[in-house]
Regions:
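Intrinsically disordered, low-complexity accessory regions that flank the conserved helicase/ATPase core
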Residues: 1-41, 139-148, 168
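Ser/Thr/Gly-rich flexible loops in soluble cytosolic domains mediating phosphotransfer, phosphorylation
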Residues: 172, 180-181, 482-483
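ATP-hydrolysis module of ASCE/P-loop NTPase motor domains
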Residues: 133-176, 239, 243, 473
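Conserved helicase motor core of SF1/SF2 NTP-dependent helicases
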Residues: 86, 96, 205-483
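A short local structural element in Rossmann-fold oxidoreductases
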Residues: 2-6, 104, 310, 421
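ASCE P-loop NTPase helicase motor core
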Residues: 21, 25-136, 177-184, 189-318, ...
């Protein structure tokens, strides 16, 4: 970011000027999207095709708004393949290793010429064959490097058998030259592999590594862009020389987690003069603020949940544009591919349990502790009577035949998570427990939500945040139970 701040305006590319708001993004007109594409994936729906056409036609920046379950990554795979048909070179990034590996796994069956940057220990086993580290050992160019390595090893072994000092000195000299040759050939091998790859994938941070120095790309694609800090997104932009940026994400889910004490403080953007900018303001957010729907297309069909579960987030957050696919709109727990009894829980998609008036009072975890005593959970909140109700409902699901590994219990508070863990972890082996924030991006057949808050002041705290409620309501396929 220091480099970016010091860069004079005269050096800004067209894309940079658009991202800073110094120039307006060129609006895509219907005629720009008139080209009929030869779709490689016949399963795409109309909104996915529209988003791909829009991204291809956009000259500088395009946002693909993909709510959970709408096939955002599925859409990106087709977009990448369409870009390759146009002979474009792509740098594909995400804020985490798992977000990048997910794309690599989806691209792999299509024999895309790609390389994944990153340490092998941090990558999923299924993507290792595409990692730069493995390719440098298995490619044709790697064979020459291996030959030099073998020769070095042989020279090292011969030293131990040589007693003559002059001969040992000569061998050391040969090894020194071999090491120099080895480093040069290894660097050439690595550089060649990256240079010849039409698709390079890395985390946003990893895109700033030396492997991409002097490499040029036509397009940067960032998946999970609404989970990435804006500063992270500038790393591939500055290293790639790309003229187009495609961001995919959902700004109506939780933003990246910021632990800085002044993260909420509002500052003015030094480049654009815009106010209301803080660390939680993502590049996706800022582009929407600058250009609105002119740079965005939304995926409108979700393939995850029953239409009744879909109703609240669609109406409250997605302008009633989000619809359930025919294949899932009436799907219930009783329809699972194993034997499940028909009960009140397995024949309904949404169940609310009202604990009002039942003395289900919340408590702060340090209420009963001296202020000087440190608490493992800080000042998080819990509600033990509500946790007991949750246990009862989980038991009813299991008794009906739902497998524990298909059930998740989520709660917004770590204090309640600790209480639930004590009650459920050993009794229901395989059940998944997590915070609402931590469970984002995952899904289960049935989710029980423990909301915790119950007080005379009717305060709900950060549960008033719509994006947090959205994350809570979009993790389940067949049933959600809220306590």
């Amino acid at each position: 970011m220091t480099r970016l701040l010091k860069m004079p305006e005269s050096e800004h590319s067209t894309l940079m000027r658009v991202l800073f708001g110094q120039s307006s993004a060129v609006s895509v007109q219907p005629r720009d999207m008139a080209e009929e594409l030869d779709w490689l994936d016949s399963s795409l729906n109309d909104s996915q095709k529209e988003a791909i056409k829009f991204a291809l036609a956009s000259p500088e920046v395009a946002l693909i708004h993909g709510p959970p379950g709408t096939g955002k990554t599925h859409t990106l795979i087709e977009l990448i393949r369409q870009c390759l048909k146009k002979d474009l070179r792509l740098l594909v990034c995400g804020p985490s290793n798992i977000s990048v590996d997910n794309i690599v796994e989806r691209l792999s069956p299509h024999k895309v010429p790609m390389v994944r940057l990153g340490h092998p220990a941090r990558l999923l086993p299924g993507v290792l064959n595409h990692s730069l580290d493995i390719l440098t050992r298995t490619s044709d160019a790697a064979a020459l490097v291996k030959d030099i390595r073998n020769e070095m090893d042989a020279k090292q072994a011969s030293i131990r058998k040589t007693r003559n000092g002059r001969e040992r000195k000569a061998i050391y000299g040969e090894i020194k030259e071999l090491r120099k040759d080895y480093r040069q050939r290894e660097a050439a091998c690595v550089s060649g592999l990256v240079r010849e790859s039409k698709v390079v994938l890395a985390t946003l941070h990893g895109a700033g590594g030396f492997h991409l120095k002097s490499q040029e790309f036509d397009v940067v694609i960032v998946d999970e862009a609404s989970q990435a800090l804006e500063a992270q997104c500038w790393v591939p932009l500055l290293s790639s020389g790309a003229s187009k940026l495609i961001l995919a994400g959902d700004h109506l889910q939780l933003p990246p987690t910021i632990k800085s004490s002044n993260s909420k403080s509002t500052k003015q953007n030094p480049k654009t003069g815009q106010g209301d900018v803080n660390l939680e303001t993502t590049l996706f957010d800022r582009m929407l603020d600058l250009y609105g729907d002119d740079v965005k297309r939304m995926l409108t069909i979700q393939y995850r949940m029953h239409e009744k579960i879909n109703a609240f987030p669609s109406e409250a957050l997605y302008e009633s544009k989000l619809m359930a696919a025919e294949s899932v709109k009436a799907r219930l727990l009783k329809d699972l591919p194993y034997d499940v009894k028909e009960t009140e829980d397995t024949t309904e998609s949404v169940v609310f349990w009202d604990t009002q008036g039942g003395e289900f009072h919340e408590k702060t975890d340090d209420d009963d502790e001296p202020k000087s005593k440190s608490s493992l959970l800080g000042e998080s909140k819990s509600n033990e009577l509500e946790a007991a109700i949750v246990k009862k409902h989980v038991q009813s699901l299991v008794d009906a035949g739902v497998k524990a590994e298909d059930i998740a219990v989520v709660t917004p508070y770590n204090g309640q998570l600790a209480v639930l863990s004590r009650l459920l972890k050993e009794r229901f082996v395989g059940i998944e427990l997590g915070s609402i924030d931590g469970f984002q991006g995952r899904e289960k057949e049935a989710v029980v939500v423990s909301l915790v808050r119950s007080n005379a002041e009717h305060e709900v705290g950060f549960l008033a945040e719509k994006r947090r409620l959205n994350g809570m309501m979009r993790r389940h396929k067949h049933l959600i139970k809220l306590c």
